[in-house]
Swiss-Prot record:
Pathway the protein contributes to: Porphyrin-containing compound metabolism; protoporphyrin-IX biosynthesis; coproporphyrinogen-III from 5-aminolevulinate: step 2/4
Recorded GO CC terms: cytoplasm
Gene source species: Clostridium botulinum (strain Langeland / NCTC 10281 / Type F)
NCBIfam families found in the cross-reference section: hemC (TIGR00212)
The protein's name in its UniProt record: Porphobilinogen deaminase
Note on how the cofactor is bound: Binds 1 dipyrromethane group covalently.
Keywords: Porphyrin biosynthesis, Transferase
Family note: Belongs to the HMBS family.
Cofactor(s) this protein requires: dipyrromethane
PTM-bearing positions, type S-(dipyrrolylmethanemethyl)cysteine: C237
Length: 290
């Protein structure tokens, strides 16, 4: 049996797809090949995502490949997947999640707490920018886009003091050694789905159950809780929004942030993990009442 897996052309996207291909091969002895697609989001790099349609721009062209039966499945970073799936598509599996934290990479290995006043920090994320300003109001936030390597190179090219990237992506492309600091999830609440990969299929695909075997239940329900939070707040990359759900002894804890009326609101909630979707919705409702 031979499967074709669609993904973006970036090194990180290809590495993430190879992780899924390796899992499939070990589980079912299935041969897979990648279909590399340059998405609209990859082509337009000079404009921030919130001005050109959001993170869904990384997904739509890949879904077209499945619709045209050029691919059997797609691998996405779950933080790039809009909460509303197009009709006929589904996220069939979310394998075990990687590190969810954000990382700080500085020019000369200077710790975040030791940055000079007015230091220039590169990030294209509204979520990261807002939380950086809460931690250090003096910082100068500079918008940057591009793949992991391009952003790292921009530290020198654009005379930045540092940049913020997801730990998971750096680990997957073997660049974790460049990390100067790790942000705690309470001081820098991650993006919804950060660190998680999702396998997307057409609902009618005859072999979709083979992908389901790659699902990691606790990882999946944590991501689904975060996405329920996002859906309730109608959040996207136009929003300053973040959430992180974790499980210990069957108890789920979710921390979430959302900008409302020009104010960053941060709330937490705890409950049994079988109520994961209700917890995400309840956390959003708490924020809306603030």
């Amino acid at each position: 049996m031979n499967f074709i897996i669609a993904t973006r052309r970036s090194k990180l996207a290809q590495v993430q797809t190879e992780i899924i291909i390796d899992l499939l091969n070990k589980k079912h002895d299935i041969e897979c090949e990648k279909l590399l697609i340059e998405t609209v989001g990859d082509k337009i790099l000079e404009v921030s995502l919130d001005k050109i349609g959001g993170k869904g721009l990384f997904v739509k062209d890949i879904e077209v490949a499945m619709l045209e039966q050029r691919a059997d499945a797609a691998v996405h970073s779950m933080k790039d997947v809009p909460y509303e799936m197009p009709k006929g598509f589904e996220i069939i599996a979310i394998p075990k999640r990687e590190d969810v934290r954000d990382a700080f990479i500085s020019l000369d290995n200077i710790k975040f707490k030791d940055l000079r006043k007015g230091a220039k920090i590169g990030t294209s994320s509204r979520r990261r920018a807002a939380q950086l300003k809460l931690l250090r109001p003096d910082l100068d936030i500079v918008p940057i886009r591009g793949n992991v390597q391009t952003r790292i190179e921009k530290i020198k090219k654009e005379n930045l003091d540092g940049i913020i990237l997801a730990v998971a992506g750096l680990k997957r492309v073997n660049l974790e050694h460049l990390i100067t600091d790790y942000f705690d999830t309470k001081e820098m609440v991650p993006a919804i789905g950060q660190g998680a990969l999702g396998i997307e299929v057409m609902e009618e695909h005859p072999k979709k159950e083979l992908f389901k075997d790659l699902d990691h239940y606790n990882s999946k329900i944590c991501v689904l809780a975060e996405r329920a939070f996002m859906r309730e707040l109608d959040g996207d990359c136009h929003s300053t929004i973040g959430a992180y759900a974790s499980i210990k002894d069957n108890i789920m804890h979710i921390i979430g942030i959302f900008e409302r009326k020009n104010k960053i609101i941060k709330k937490e909630i705890t409950g049994t993990k079988d109520q994961y979707e209700k917890l995400g919705i309840a956390l959003a409702e708490h924020i809306l009442k603030d």
